[in-house]
Amino acid sequence: MTYKKFLPILEIIIIVVLAVFPIMLTMPYRAYVYLSWEGAYRLSEGQLPFRDFGLPVGGMYWVVPAIFFKIFGVQVITLLKAQAFLNILSGLAFRSILKTVGVNPVVAVTSVLLYCISYSFQNFWPWYNHSVFV
């Protein structure tokens, strides 16, 4: 297998592994994680933001965790699963931007690794600023 075929596969492996890795560990809670929990829980129960309950930010931040609550159940680990999904999407979007710009494949793999370690991997709990950026 040539490196031109191997490097895109390596990029995807890096993105998925670094996004899913925090699910397998006991991670420390982030401050104010209850905001993610409560908003997603209320949405998953059918309540509407700004009508049934107040939110400090826009309502779309809680949609993905609420969908994951419906699929996987209302548990704290579900917030990590939702964030892993968002991290995979953000990594693939970053990879797509690099491909569109025409970055050298070796530089692209290095950039994806740096992005995943410095940005995506550190945001393993749902956080408003990260989700809005994605």
Regions inferred by a protein language model and the residue ranges of each:
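Extracytoplasmic catalytic/substrate-binding loops of multi-pass membrane glycan-assembly enzymes
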Residues: 24-39, 50-67, 74
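Transmembrane-helix motifs of polytopic, lipid-linked glycan transferases
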Residues: 81-105
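Short helix- or helix-capping micro-motifs
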Residues: 108-118, 134
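Short acidic/glycine- and proline-prone juxtamembrane loop motifs at membrane-interface regions
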Residues: 122-132
